[in-house]
């Protein structure tokens, strides 16, 4: 008996696996929300302290750095909203859930980093022609160190958790915090340069840091845009294929497709089995493949497994179907031609 699972025979998540996958997704989203809350608080305090210092030092560079810190804190809000949305159940309209909101938040973060780099370069170029005078150099330097430590702490925290839960957007937000930490360093070096009698040190360091920010934008955007276009790391499909191919009853893995949806991965796998198997036996093999995939791939939250008989794998089966001989095809075409010549016996809707 030929076995091919489609709607009724697709391997679905068993109750145990379903609860496990959902629990893992909720936990990951909860961790993401916690990170955004903590980083928002840390960067908010950092920015407020710097703003107070700006008030009595008049440091333009420190003011720019303070604005960057407020901006970085603000980018935590759409990411927070995205993690919250990802916990909602799928609907008829959004039947894959709301994970893509996280990728869109990542895009906003990349654009924010780019804006920071452009602003830093603009300010540095302006200061080349008119180096600013800075009062209370030691206070400005301490504020810059405080800003750097606050931003770098948040950056390390965001990137660590982002890698653990598979969130490109959270990693990008970590890079955003690091960028603001670099602008704090620019303020520090500028203050030291003025103290040493080299006022041009401030804008020169600012330009160097602007170039570093541009590089961060390029590297971060690769990951974010890749996920928006359903890209995945090249080794992931190979891992899926390897796990599926060593499962008992699988003779071949015909096709593998994997994509990210927020911080979770979805997979579609076509496996080839003995055509003499019953529908139930083919379904059991598919369930086992599903089980192995969920337990062996860290970020995978669901996998759809299709079963094809040997000789007609994947799209080949859909083109020809089981027992779809040339005679049957001619019969179908002849029947279709005859039906065109028959009068329409349908009900009339005319009044």
Describe every region a protein language model picked out.
Residues 38-50:
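The first (N-terminal) embedded transmembrane alpha-helix
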Residues 2-39, 55-57, 61-67, 71-351:
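Alpha-helical transmembrane segments and adjacent TM-loop junctions that form the membrane-embedded core
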């Amino acid at each position: 008996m030929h076995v091919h699972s489609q709607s009724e025979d697709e391997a679905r998540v068993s109750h145990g696996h379903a609860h496990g996958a959902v629990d893992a997704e909720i936990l990951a989203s909860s961790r993401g929300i916690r990170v955004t809350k903590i980083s928002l608080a840390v960067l908010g305090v950092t920015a407020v302290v710097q703003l107070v210092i700006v008030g009595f030092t008049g440091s333009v560079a420190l003011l720019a750095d303070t604005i960057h810190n407020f901006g970085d804190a603000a980018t935590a809000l759409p990411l927070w909203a995205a993690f919250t949305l990802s916990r909602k159940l799928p609907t008829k309209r959004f039947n894959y859930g709301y994970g893509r909101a996280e990728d869109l938040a990542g895009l906003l973060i990349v654009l924010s980093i780019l804006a920071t780099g452009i602003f830093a370069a603009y300010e540095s170029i302006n200061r080349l022609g008119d180096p600013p005078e800075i009062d209370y150099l030691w206070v400005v330097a301490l504020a810059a160190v405080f800003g750097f430590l606050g931003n770098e702490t948040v950056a390390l925290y965001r990137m660590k958790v982002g890698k653990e839960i598979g969130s490109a957007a959270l990693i990008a937000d970590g890079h955003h915090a690091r960028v603001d930490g670099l602008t704090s360093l620019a303020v520090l070096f500028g203050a030291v340069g003025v103290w040493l009698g080299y006022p041009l040190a401030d804008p020169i360091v600012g330009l160097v840091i602007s170039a570093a920010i541009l590089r961060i934008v390029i590297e971060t955007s690769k990951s974010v845009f890749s996920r928006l276009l359903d890209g995945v790391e090249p080794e992931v499909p190979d891992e899926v294929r390897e796990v599926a191919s060593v499962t008992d009853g699988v003779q071949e893995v015909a096709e593998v497709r994997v994509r990210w949806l927020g911080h979770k991965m979805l997979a579609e796998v076509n496996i080839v089995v003995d055509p003499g198997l019953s529908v139930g036996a083919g379904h059991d093999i598919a369930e086992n493949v599903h089980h192995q995939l969920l337990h062996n791939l860290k970020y995978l939250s669901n996998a759809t497994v299709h079963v094809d008989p040997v000789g007609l794998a994947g799209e080949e089966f859909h083109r020809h179907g089981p027992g779809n001989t040339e005679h049957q095809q001619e019969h179908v075409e002849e029947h279709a031609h005859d039906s065109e010549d028959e009068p329409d016996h349908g009900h009339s809707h005319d009044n």
